[in-house]
Amino acid sequence: MNKNILTIFMFGLLLSFNSFIQADSEKIESDGTVAEFNYFTVTDPSKFMTALNKFNKSECAKKWRDESGADTSLWSLRGSGSSHFILVVYENWNEMEKGRAVFTSCADAAMMIKSFQTSTDTNRSWNWISENALAGRNWQTNSVFSKINFKVDEGRELEYAAAWKKLMNSQLDNVPGSFGLNTISYGNRYVSHMVYLGADSMSELSNALKNVRSTSDFAEFASSVQDIRVGVNTELVQYVTSFNGE
């Protein structure tokens, strides 16, 4: 009898421990990263990629990566006024400062930027700088994203973040991939924040969005933020390639 009670107790303790480990692995917090989103409307894809690949193999790009840890990739867009963006991620503001110092001082970078005059519609080029506010799971394991751009009333940012975090904590089983909330620190005239939801395929992403939006938790979230948030647009983002010198 005592042996059975001990077995039940140990089994319950094991379940509790596993639940603790699972909850701990699903932390939703800032990863500390900052990023440049450089938006382009590409008119000559071949010239555009040639310029990017040439710079990628340059000494300037190597120095840029080595001194700042810049993580650079190209993404395609649908549901946007732009066709692509180049994403440059740094671990923190100090690394971005190092990276900007190198990038803006070398001829190879200047030549690449000049080449965009013949491969993109430069009248429609723009950029912003974001800072991660909350993140769950590793976004770099996913290849397709829903990126939701919106504006939050000034002074209500923490209120929105708390509501969004509560929603995502309730939807961990419905979201197979990564997710995050970024604050747009610079270039925020029209957009103050973006939310991303990642997956490994468009069908997986679509199903995740449908599942989340069909819940009472989402209805509660939407109701709680409707007076402090204005939606701008939702973009489908797909991975194209990374630039790591190879």
Go through each PLM region and give its residues.
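Bacterial N-terminal signal peptides that target proteins for export
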Residues: 1-9
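Bacterial N-terminal signal peptides
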Residues: 8-17
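Short S/T/G/P-rich N-terminal loop/turn motif that feeds into the first structured element of a domain
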Residues: 22-246
